[in-house]
């Protein structure tokens, strides 16, 4: 391997896909969360048979399972994808009711290892915590009797998200129209949450904000609003995971691809190379590609392009 090739790899921080010989081309790799350049995969899945008002959604990291929370059934539905990351191959497996805690469930978030999930809704203004004895299997789920009240900041919470290590919680709702930030003194335990006195307003982007999601590094945040539902809004954070440093930097308009009148939930998978959102008006999950390609190196000249 040549010295210039190694320097290229270090500079871009990504290992090459392949090497084609001394006179060939090295392709460095791909980058996810390229939301502004997102393209519809022409793939979707209708949840109508189980849930006619889908809101929060989550995807297992390996792309083989989908989870949908909605207020039609007040439960979390589990689906298997026979082809990883291909939403059109989903089939229903089981469900777990959250109706004892929530009558209007909205937001859903799964811990990255699949042993816990969290739900928020407008009926109680609380974030509820659940555990699964078998990871990613909602038939083994149970309520942990752990919750966190957010009504001092938001009385109509719709969306929630966590920092990847479980030490930060974020809640977005329709009343304050802001993303609120909390610290968990014990990671992934919502009963230990406290408000950071930090928030970020999205009111200028819509009056009915419903969803908040972060990229894996906390340097970008994505929101949706029910009254401007065709848009996925992009926000850049100059300090990772600190929403007080956020600013609106772009959008993805999905109106040319789907009739997005009521986006209810949003989630990324495959290192941010796939994006999915739920559509309440027609009970459907849509799939997008959100990937960009890095530079390639001409091995004969050392030129990148």
Residue ranges and their predicted role:
Residues 2-305:
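Polar, enzyme-active/binding microenvironments
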């Amino acid at each position: 391997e040549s010295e210039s090739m190694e320097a290229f790899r270090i500079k871009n921080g990504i290992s090459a896909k392949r090497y084609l010989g001394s006179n060939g081309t090295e392709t460095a790799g791909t980058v996810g969360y390229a939301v502004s350049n997102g393209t519809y995969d022409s793939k979707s899945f209708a949840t109508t048979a189980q849930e006619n008002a889908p809101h929060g959604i989550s995807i297992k990291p390996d792309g083989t399972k989908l989870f949908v929370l909605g207020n039609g059934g007040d439960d979390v539905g589990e689906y298997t994808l026979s082809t990883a990351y291909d939403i059109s191959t989903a089939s229903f497996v089981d469900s777990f009711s959250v109706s004892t805690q929530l009558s209007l469930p909205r937001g859903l978030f799964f811990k990255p290892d699949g042993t816990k999930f969290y739900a928020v809704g407008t009926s109680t203004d609380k974030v509820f915590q659940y555990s699964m004895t078998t990871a990613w299997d909602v038939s083994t789920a149970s309520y942990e009797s752990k919750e966190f009240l957010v009504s001092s900041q938001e009385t109509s919470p719709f969306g929630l998200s966590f920092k990847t290590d479980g030490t930060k919680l974020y809640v977005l709702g329709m009343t304050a129209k802001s993303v609120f930030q909390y610290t968990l003194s014990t990671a992934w335990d919502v009963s230990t949450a406290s408000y950071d006195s930090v928030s970020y307003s999205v009111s200028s982007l819509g009056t009915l904000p419903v969803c908040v999601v972060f990229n894996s590094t906390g340097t970008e945040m994505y929101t949706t609003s029910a009254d401007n539902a065709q848009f996925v809004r992009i926000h850049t954070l100059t300090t990772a995971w600190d929403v007080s440093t956020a600013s609106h930097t772009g959008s993805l308009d999905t109106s040319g691809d789907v009739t997005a009148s009521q986006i209810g939930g949003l989630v990324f998978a495959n290192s941010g190379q796939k994006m999915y959102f739920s559509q309440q008006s027609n009970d459907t999950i849509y799939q997008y590609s959100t990937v960009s390609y890095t530079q390639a190196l001409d091995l004969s000249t050392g030129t990148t392009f």
